[in-house]
A protein has these predicted regions:
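Membrane-proximal basic amphipathic "stem/tether" segments
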Residues: 2-17
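Aromatic-rich carbohydrate-binding modules that target alpha-glucans
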Residues: 35-80, 90-112
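N-terminal edge beta-strand
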Residues: 23-24
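A short, amphipathic beta-strand motif
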Residues: 27-32
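Beta-strand elements of modular eukaryotic interaction domains
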Residues: 19, 33-34
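Compositionally biased low-complexity segments at domain edges in trafficked proteins
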Residues: 116-154
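Exposed beta-strand face motif in extracellular beta-rich ectodomains
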Residues: 81-85
Length: 154
């Protein structure tokens, strides 16, 4: 009986919260080229709790790799179709630089099965590459920090 009540409550939550039931996106992987200064780190902040709701608390911290490639992955444990995000440079708990321009926007409803339809993805500089694998539910986002951005250390 308790299990049935929980299922009904969950179904009501989905209806009233506007959550679209898709169950396809499982994880988002990031690969960002950014030559940072000592002590700086690259994070992903965004419009959903998995990316801190635009704050560092709960955001996705990327990890430095050889060649100034920052990588990270965020597991998505709920159904989402749309979110916005930006890359930021952080040092000692303070955001030093936000990715310039408008927010990056991901609308999974507009991505084709081969994962190459960019009508569902928007990047201000048009210097991101997106690959969505419907079979394993993984979205890979690759980004090159622009050389002329003040947060970039050439």
């Amino acid at each position: 009986m308790e299990k049935k009540v929980l299922i009904v409550l969950y179904e009501l939550y989905k209806i009233y919260s506007g959550v679209t039931i898709k169950n396809s996106l499982k994880s988002i992987k990031f690969s960002v080229y950014c030559a940072t200064r000592p002590g700086q780190e690259v994070w992903v902040l965004g419009s959903i709790p998995e990316f801190g709701n635009w704050g560092l608390n709960g955001a996705c911290k990327l990890h430095w790799n050889k060649g100034h490639i920052w990588k990270g992955e965020r597991i998505i444990e709920r159904d989402i179709d749309y979110f916005e995000f930006k890359f930021v440079i952080e040092k000692k708990g303070k955001i030093e630089w936000w990715q310039e321009g408008g927010n990056n926007k991901i609308n999974l409803k507009n991505i084709t099965k081969d994962g190459k339809n960019k009508s569902g993805m928007y990047n201000y500089y048009n210097n991101s590459r997106y690959t969505y694998n419907h079979e394993n539910g993984t979205l890979l986002i690759e980004y090159d920090w622009p050389d002329d951005d003040p947060g970039y250390d050439s």
